[in-house]
Each structure stands twice: as structure tokens, then as C-alpha cells.
């Protein structure tokens, strides 16, 4: 397949799956296996980081009005009942720290030992079952229908649950934070919005850290990666993936925010279960 067409295709996959609760990591790995992609460890790692960054950067653009509102109302919030500690911006930082510290320690200890197809398929399957149960049992029964009404305890809980996605590839950061939000008493829309906001610091920091490691020719576990030789062809490939991922992710976020207000997450849970079973069956037959 033409390299530029492949970059566009993978950009579409990343843009479609980064913010849906289906695991972008798993889908990129599936594409890598099915399409027999061999770009070299170094360039593949860099390309994955760049298209992920493209998807992430659509969030500040899409939520620019909401972000401006939060900064303008700090520290009391739009309700006027907040302190600096309970403001949505602070809660986002608290949740991020509750993820960042343990996730960094776990990935240092575990490295890439859990990045197997079996683990990924199992995480997709189990995550789908959990999401289905949570969405059915807690379908918009929560009292927290806005980020402005969140508590410190909810932020800590969601941040800690997000660690699962860092440790077990295939879990999905979106799935873990959305389900945690619903379990803590948030409505679907509120849980989804906080998941999006939390992903901004989480994924920007994680992506920058991964990029730094890649530029130093190291993977997450510290193992050596091949040296990436960047020429015009390589830069164009990265640019295509980045731009396509950004555009697709922007429209996915807009669609998902509308979808969740009238529908639930069960269709995504079913999809995860089906894909998880298929991945496990394929892995066991190899």
C-alpha cells in the first residue's frame, strides 16, 4: 500500500477510536497485524505518537468556549459555590495527578510485558462487559449532571481508574474514565465531558514523554529503538497522519457529545466484546 494512503488510513483509525471507548491502541495494533505494516520500530513509534497528538489537539479547539468559561470563572465557578480546590480546572489537575504518578511507576516496573495480543483482547472483552453493566445499572441515575457539580472524591476516583488504561493496553482511557464517572454518580454526558477534559493534560504529557523517549531511541521499557532517519517523504507521511487524525477526531468528538445525550454506551460495549472475542480467537490460532 502507498505510504501516504496508509498514513491517511491510520489517521482515520486513530481519529475514530481515540475518544470512543474502544481503545485506539488495540485498533492500531490490529491494523499493524492485518496490513503487515513494517515501518521500523522507531518510525512506527513516532508515527503512532504524532497521529495521537493530532487527535488530542482537536479537544482544545472543540471545547474552547467551555475552557474559556472555566478560566473566566476561576475560582468560584459559574455557580459561585466553588473554592479553588473544587473548581473544575483544579479537579482536572487532581485527576491527572492521580493518574500520572501511579501510571509512571507501573510502566517503569512493568514495561512492555503486558503488551501482548492476548492481554489486549482480554482487556477489550472485559472492558466491554464492565461498560455494558455500568451503563445499564447507572444509566443517567447520577446527581452530578455537570462538571461544575463534581467533588474532589469523584476526581480522585476517576483519575485512579484511568491508570488501568496505562497498565493494560486495550482497556481504553475513555472507557475507564467514563465508567468510573458513572459509578461515582455522574450522568453519561457529564462523565463523557470530564473524560474529554481529563484527556487533555493526560495525553499531552504522555505523548510528549513518549516522543522524548523515541527521540532518544528508547521505548517505554527503556529498550533500544532503531534510529529514525527523517527525510521529506517521512515528514510528509507524519503530516498526513497528523492532519487526518485531527480532522476525524474533531468530528467524532462533536458527534459523540450529541450521541450520548440521547443514547448510551451499550453499542460500544457490544462492539468491544465482539472485537475482543475475535482478537482472542485469532491470537490463540496463531
Swiss-Prot record:
Enzyme class: hydrolase
Chief place of localization: membrane
GO biological process: cell wall organization; peptidoglycan biosynthetic process; regulation of cell shape; response to antibiotic
Membrane-topology annotation of the record: Multi-pass membrane protein
GO molecular function: undecaprenyl-diphosphatase activity
EC number per UniProt: 3.6.1.27
Keywords: Antibiotic resistance, Cell inner membrane, Cell membrane, Cell shape, Cell wall biogenesis/degradation, Hydrolase, Membrane, Peptidoglycan synthesis, Transmembrane, Transmembrane helix
InterPro entries: UppP
Domain of life (superkingdom): Bacteria
Transmembrane segment boundaries: 43-63, 91-111, 118-138, 150-170, 189-209, 236-256, 264-284
GO cellular component, one term: plasma membrane
UniProt-annotated location(s): Cell inner membrane
Reactions the enzyme catalyzes: di-trans,octa-cis-undecaprenyl diphosphate + H2O = di-trans,octa-cis-undecaprenyl phosphate + phosphate + H(+)
Note: Bacitracin is thought to be involved in the inhibition of peptidoglycan synthesis by sequestering undecaprenyl diphosphate, thereby reducing the pool of lipid carrier available.
Family under the similarity heading: Belongs to the UppP family.
Function noted in UniProt: Catalyzes the dephosphorylation of undecaprenyl diphosphate (UPP). Confers resistance to bacitracin.
The protein's name in its UniProt record: Undecaprenyl-diphosphatase
